[in-house]
Every structure is written in structure tokens, then in C-alpha cells.
Amino acid sequence: MFLLVLIPLISPLWAGEIVTQNIKQWAKKAVEEEKALRPIAARNTVAVLYFENKTGKSELDPLQKGLALMLITDLFNVKGLQVVERVKLQALVEEMGFGTSGLVEAGNAPRVGRILGARWLIGGEITRGSIKIQSSVLDVGEKKIIGQPMVMGEMEDLFRLEKGLLFEIINFLKIDITPQEREELRRYCSTNVRALNLLFRGIDASDRGNYEKAAQFYESAIKEDPKICIARGALQELQALGLIDSKKRSRDMLRTLRDRGSLTDQLSPEDATKRVRTPKDIPSSQGRETP
């Protein structure tokens, strides 16, 4: 992974998980006006690229967007950070014709970061072994690597690996967090790896415009873990935008979504075995403001 010191031009609104026509138009205009961008001093703006799967195992492909999704969700809750919406990254990927691997090719990442308006750009790769996430922190101004965080473990520990990476990133960004904030950031999106995988597949299906399939993945993720983050909001966003046929959706499922707590439920490490509901301030899918 690398962090690049770049130029910020970030929108203050969080755009949810749907790459809307407005977001696509933004990406098209941003690329067209790329040469006119001026260096603007701004603090603590971060964008997270998709991770590259170098394991040769296609079953790990959902982690490419999934790891980025979890990091973005967590970094959004770090006070003092501005986080670029994932949908803006996705729109740029489509507009610029990059695949997931193309984002991290030489010269592409700084360009993407500049258009996104990010001071720091986070990316990385998943390599062979159980799960090994190798990363580097690059200071572009100084042209030197200032850190190389790395986490590794079993697939069943994915949710813990992401937290380890999160706190390494926070350390390299030299962001001070209180013990209370640290404890809140330790809350898991889910400890159910199957549920996480279904969520990640739903995000990818949505990006591809297969909204009915995305809804099915979200529903399956919620059935696996009713307290999983993001999935409820993403499903309700699909419904609110009229992208799925709500009449075909199970009334029982919709009732379950309303009755099983808020969109912000997450699990603390202590709750991982207790399965006790704990509220967490994950932003809703629309109208979210960056701290």
C-alpha cells in the first residue's frame, strides 16, 4: 500500500454506494478539466484505492473492493479526516478505463489522487499465503517511503486484519485519537466472514449496474449477520432510487430490515462472541457529511 501527498478538491457530501448519473458526470468533467487543476493547500484528505489481488485465487477478488470499503467506513469516523467517497473512485475507474490493477500502475495512482483531490492516497495488494496485505507509505514530496505496514493471517480473521491495517494507517498519518475514539474504531462491521463476502459482492454487482443481484447479496448478508454494517443502507438506497422492484422484494425481509435495529449497528471486539447489539455512528447512505 502507499500513501501519496496530493492535491485536495473533495466534496463535503457522502454519496452512498450507488454510482449515480451525477457522479458519472462529475468524473467525466473532472477528467476533461484535469490539466486545469491547481494545487490547493488542504489538510487531511484521504482516498482509498481498491486493493489488488495477487494471490491468483479468484475467490478473494471481492476483497479488492471490500477492504477499501471497510477502511473508508472506518476512516470516515476519524475526526479531522476528510474521506473521498468510494463511488467517486469507482466513477473515475470507469471514466479513465482503469481496471483494479490499473489503479496501482506507475503514474496512474498520483493522477487518480490528484483528480479525487486527495492529500493522501491509500492502496495495496493481497499476496500469497493465508492472507497477506503488504503496504508502503510514500511521501511524494520527499520521494521516499516513510513506512511499510503489513498484516497477515487467516481468512477467518479478515475483520481483525482490517482493523490492524486501519490503526497502522492512522499512525503513519500521525493522527491523534483518544482512547474512546480508538475503542469505537475497534468495532467490527461484522465478524461473519461469509456475510462480509456477500456484502462485498453486492457492492461489486451494484457498480456493474446489476441492482437486483446486488439487492440479493445485501439481503443474504443481512440474513447471515443482521448487525452487519452498510448492507441495510445500501439496500434501502437501491429502493429509494427506484433501481430495484420493491414489489418483488419479500415483505418479511423488509419488515426484518426495519425491526432489527438501526443502520449503524456494529460489533465491538467484546461483542464478537456475545452478539449484543451496540450502536455505532456509521454514516447513512445519503447526505453524509465528511468530518
Which residue stretches match the model-derived regions?
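Catalytic-center loop of serine/cysteine hydrolases
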Residues: 24-33, 90-196
